[in-house]
């Protein structure tokens, strides 16, 4: 077996190459001692097994104690600690000179290296030609030109891994005699300490460049003190010598003609990064994303809803009825398992459209610019602009958004981002928004969704600001981020990335929704006395009693006693937001006897025909749906219309529905998010996030509802608004004067 490390700069196409090499044979875990994700994969070449470990993207192998992210520490440490046979160094052919800096450091390890020269087609399009044979001769290692996104050059790269036993000699750098002598002395001291010759050579260069995390701390610190006494600028001299050598190589192997794409990127950036137009363009892009998800995705929602409703809910109910099964069994299977499957599959098109648009923004190069656009506004409040990149990831799911915070250099910035990310509207919340928009907002539904996303962003910024003034005081680190050139992503790549994200989401949602729906069906069938109900609408069931007992707590935000299913939806939503829609569908259907009607009038072929007929009907109305997105999102089946009708009667109109959505937006996303906060920060931050999110959600929802209903009962509304305002001020005071000192605690101490 051959074990290869995959390493390269950020945005070099490393992950695309990893996917091309390993396909579905991948494993995801964590690096030892930290929560940074570790990706490994393997593939067979004949009878030879090759294992690939994907290291985090880095610009350099120098690891300092401060000013470096966990990802960079992992990459720098892995090339030393892991057992491997060779290194695959992925280089962006469009930025050869910049990427060869990391290559020059890898050569100093003395390990076999294969250079994968990626994005050759893009380089040619930009007028860049590279003599790969000459580059191979000058570097002394295999150089394989590839196009990872098109699978071009992958077989040649795979073959090169079978013949990568030749060790690489470091590049000869032009250093002064004094500087070279210092490096030799460092190397000899390391050898005398027991280091192997190859590692001693590598460590001496890292120490000279200011690496403080290698070797034994006491020994390396003593060497660094001596180094500073003899030559304080050795790190600068080394970097300069590297760039001189790299420039010589690039001059010999690369020819660059006029670059039309660079001119295009520069011209487009003048507009996208314009001082006054940048923010409006950013909000316009976000707005287009919601329009696309609600309308284009919603056009296919009826097909999934009607077809799965016909097969899994009505079909299973009819079949069990023919078998003379008890009503509680029909309710458990049809409105439990069947409704769970129906709910999971129904919101696939909206979520898929969301993921597709996010992938388009990321691969086109705009997402990196979004961080720069919001950087100035966020830094004015002392918040890191770079944190907005993980927060945008939160539009898909809060869990990877929080995990992406590990790429931030500052511990303070990382913790701020971890605490801010849960307020970003994830795709699971979008499924809830789509249902309520269809039921309560017959026009301008996309504006409602946009407002919720905007409120989530503002609340995240507000949370960061409060933490900056209390437990996480300090200054935001400067934003240093590479702006990639604009790309025209292929449809195949977009569909593949969308498919990977969607598959993970549906699997995660389905394994939660279906069991929850079964449990809810069971609780709704079991009475308080322990008996089994024979009907579907049972006000004496355990579920009904629990919901009715808790519902008065939510009365100030417009949830009345008869709307207890909405309360149960909030409770199950703490497990996962994907479950809320399934909970509401299941409970409202049971309360309204919808399942009985569906079973009595079951028409399989009629349902399938209606499902397929909904696609052209919705697509033909797409133009008007851009102004009225509900027409693309609402379900046309009798069952869906019945559920929407029950919902519209139970909630206090559009005001009550919007107050409910505000609570859904702001309270904890799911237990998975809380667990990740526990891992990425610590237990104290997790509980702080839980308490803060509930306080903010309850206060915002109550203040909105009471403010909207102020004319109906001014005295009552005024009391509630004042009470909520005072409660929020009290919580802020606790944050301000807290003696816990969360920001001083080691975030890795998970005790």
Curated annotation (Swiss-Prot):
Membrane topology annotation: Multi-pass membrane protein
Binding site for GTP 2: 33-37
TM regions (residue ranges): 276-296, 341-361, 385-405, 422-442, 447-467, 512-532, 539-559, 657-677, 685-705, 715-735
InterPro entries attached to this UniProt entry: Fe2_transport_prot-B, Fe2_transport_prot_B_C, FeoB_GTPase, G_FEOB_dom, Gate_dom, GTP-bd, P-loop_NTPase
Cellular localisation: Cell inner membrane
Annotated binding of GTP 1, by residue: 8-15
Location of the FeoB-type G domain: 1-167
Cellular component GO terms, alphabetical: plasma membrane
Superkingdom per UniProt: Bacteria
Coiled coil: none
Binding site for GTP: 118-121, 147-149
Principal subcellular localization: membrane
Keyword Nucleotide-binding in annotation: yes
GO molecular function terms listed in the Swiss-Prot or TrEMBL record: ferrous iron transmembrane transporter activity; GTP binding
Gene3D superfamilies (UniProt xref): 1.10.287.1770, P-loop containing nucleotide triphosphate hydrolases
Binding site for GTP 3: 54-57
Keywords (A to Z) from UniProt: Cell inner membrane, Cell membrane, GTP-binding, Ion transport, Iron, Iron transport, Membrane, Nucleotide-binding, Transmembrane, Transmembrane helix, Transport
Similarity remark: Belongs to the TRAFAC class TrmE-Era-EngA-EngB-Septin-like GTPase superfamily. FeoB GTPase (TC 9.A.8) family.
Stated role: Probable transporter of a GTP-driven Fe(2+) uptake system.
Protein's name in the database: Fe(2+) transporter FeoB
Originating organism: Legionella pneumophila (strain Paris)
């Amino acid at each position: 077996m051959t074990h290869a490390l995959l390493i390269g700069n950020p945005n070099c196409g490393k992950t695309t190459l990893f996917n091309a090499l390993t396909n579905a044979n991948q494993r995801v875990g964590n690096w030892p001692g930290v929560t940074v994700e570790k990706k490994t994969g393997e593939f067979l070449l004949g009878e030879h097994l090759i294992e690939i470990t994907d290291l985090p993207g880095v610009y350099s192998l120098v690891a300092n104690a401060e000013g470096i992210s966990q990802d960079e520490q992992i990459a720098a440490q892995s090339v030393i600690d892991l057992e491997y046979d060779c290194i695959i160094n992925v280089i962006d052919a469009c930025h050869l000179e910049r990427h060869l800096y990391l290559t020059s450091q890898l050569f100093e390890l003395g390990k076999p290296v294969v250079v994968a020269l990626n994005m050759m087609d893009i380089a040619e399009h930009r007028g860049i030609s590279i003599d790969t044979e000459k580059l191979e001769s000058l570097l002394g290692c295999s150089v394989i030109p590839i196009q990872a996104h098109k699978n071009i050059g992958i077989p040649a790269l795979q073959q090169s891994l079978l013949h990568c036993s030749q060790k690489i000699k470091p590049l000869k750098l032009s250093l002064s005699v004094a500087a070279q002598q210092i490096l030799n002395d460092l190397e000899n001291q390391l050898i005398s300490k027991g280091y192997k010759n190859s590692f001693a050579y590598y460590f001496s260069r890292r120490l000279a460049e200011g690496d403080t995390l290698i070797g034994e701390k006491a020994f390396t610190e003593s060497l660094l003190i001596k180094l500073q006494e003899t030559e304080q600028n050795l790190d600068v001299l080394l970097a300069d010598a590297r760039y001189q050598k790299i420039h010589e190589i690039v001059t010999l192997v690369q020819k660059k003609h006029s670059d039309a794409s660079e001119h295009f990127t520069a011209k487009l950036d003048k507009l996208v990064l314009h001082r006054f137009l940048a923010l409006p363009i950013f909000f316009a892009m976000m707005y287009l994303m919601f329009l696309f998800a609600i309308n284009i995705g919603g056009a296919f929602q009826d097909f999934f809803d009607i077809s799965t409703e016909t097969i899994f809910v009505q079909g299973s109910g009819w079949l069990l009825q023919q078998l003379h099964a008890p009503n509680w069994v029909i309710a458990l299977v049809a409105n439990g398992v069947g409704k769970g499957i129906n709910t999971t599959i129904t919101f696939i098109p909206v979520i898929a459209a969301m993921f597709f648009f996010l992938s388009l923004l990321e691969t086109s190069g705009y997402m990196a610019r979004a961080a720069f656009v919001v950087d100035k506004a966020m830094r004015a409040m002392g918040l890191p602009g770079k944190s907005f990149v993980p927060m945008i990831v939160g539009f898909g799911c809060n869990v990877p958004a929080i995990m992406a915070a590990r790429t931030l250099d500052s511990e303070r910035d990382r913790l701020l981002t971890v605490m801010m990310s849960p307020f970003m509207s994830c795709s699971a919340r979008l499924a809830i928004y789509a249902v309520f928009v269809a039921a309560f907002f017959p026009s301008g539904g996309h504006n409602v969704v946009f407002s919720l996303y905007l409120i989530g962003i503002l609340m995240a910024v507000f949370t960061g600001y409060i933490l900056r003034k209390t437990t996480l005081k300090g200054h935001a680190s400067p934003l240093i981020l590479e702006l990639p050139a604009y790309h025209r992503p292929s449809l195949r790549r977009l569909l593949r990335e969308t498919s990977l994200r969607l598959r993970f989401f549906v699997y995660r949602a389905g394994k939660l929704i279906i069991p929850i729906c079964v449990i809810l069906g069971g609780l709704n069938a079991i009475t308080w006395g322990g008996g089994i109900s024979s009907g579907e609408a049972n006000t004496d069931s355990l579920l009904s009693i629990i919901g009715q007992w808790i519902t008065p707590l939510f009365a100030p935000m417009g949830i009345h006693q008869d709307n207890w299913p909405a309360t149960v939806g909030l409770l199950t939503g703490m497990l996962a937001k994907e479950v809320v829609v399934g909970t509401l569908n299941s409970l409202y259907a049971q309360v309204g006897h919808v399942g009985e009607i569906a079973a009595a009038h079951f028409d399989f072929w009629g349902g399938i025909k209606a499902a397929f007929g909904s696609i052209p009907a919705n697509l033909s109305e797409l133009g008007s749906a851009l102004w009225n997105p509900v027409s693309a999102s609402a379900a046309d089946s009798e069952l869906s219309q019945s559920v929407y009708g029950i919902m519209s009667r139970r909630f206090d109109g559009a005001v009550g529905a919007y107050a409910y959505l505000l609570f859904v937006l702001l309270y904890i996303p799911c237990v998975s998010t809380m667990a990740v906060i526990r891992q990425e920060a610590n237990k104290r931050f997790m509980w702080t996030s839980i308490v803060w999110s509930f306080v903010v959600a309850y206060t915002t929802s109550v203040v909105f509802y009471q403010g909207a209903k102020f004319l109906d009962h001014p005295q009552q509304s005024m009391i509630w608004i004042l009470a909520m305002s005072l409660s929020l001020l009290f919580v802020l005071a606790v944050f301000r004067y807290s003696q816990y000192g969360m920001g001083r605690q080691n975030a890795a101490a998970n005790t």
